[in-house]
Amino acid sequence: MKFAIIVPARKGSKTVKDKNLYKLKNKSLVEYTFNQIKNLNFKKFILSNDERILRKASKYKINILYKRPKETSGSKSSTVKTLLHFVKWLKIYDKDISELVVLQPTSPLRERKDIINAINIYKKKKFYSLFSISESLEHPYEAINIKNLKNNSWNYVLKKSKKFYRRQDFDINSYFINGAIYIININKLKQFKSIVTNNHGLYVMRKFNSFDINDFEDFKIAKKLI
């Protein structure tokens, strides 16, 4: 197995303008990921259509930069589509790389040890794919679907199997995909057209390290956590 670290960081965002470059304390958001990977002994690729992000990557001695083409840089372009386009180029650049470790820039509290531990589990268990998860902040039994707020029309998203009097007695252990780490075998990515395969692993992260930034409110919270 030969791993490569991939950081997809496109230009712009619908929720926060230039989110990956938005300042969080003394660094831009994407720099937290650059800092996490700078001493890892893997080839590193920054996938971006923003020259400013590519320049920042160079400052962290991440010199393998891949400028995303227009067709994989829009807000509707999925991570899978971006990766599939990238591996075509990668086949020419370094055909020995077999596994991709994808790190979203929106996880500034992810730690270097999380990345290493996830890779080690992936290798030990011989998975084809893996993603990181953490315990849900709220249980799905307590989630509701609002059909019409004005008419106070709603229902529970997940029906309980029986009546529970205490939250700790719920019969489902609820976790969510936190988006911090994805690992995928390149051949399986091309086969399944997905980052989830028929031999998939999970890596459990602490809630604190799983914090994901999507909007301005998240930035405000993150500033207090960092």
What are these regions (language model features)?
Residues 52-101, 109-110, 116-117:
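Short phosphate-binding loop-to-helix
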Residues 191, 202-226:
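Hydrophobic helical membrane-anchoring modules
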Residues 40-45, 128, 208-209:
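Short active-site oxyanion
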Residues 29-44, 55-56, 60:
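A short, N-terminal amphipathic alpha-helix
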Residues 1-17:
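N-terminal nucleotide-binding beta1-loop-alpha1 segment
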Residues 81, 99, 108-199, 204-205:
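Conserved core of the sugar-phosphate nucleotidyltransferase
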Residues 2-7, 30, 44-46:
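Hydrophobic targeting segments
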Residues 22-23, 46, 102, 211:
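Conserved SAM-binding loop
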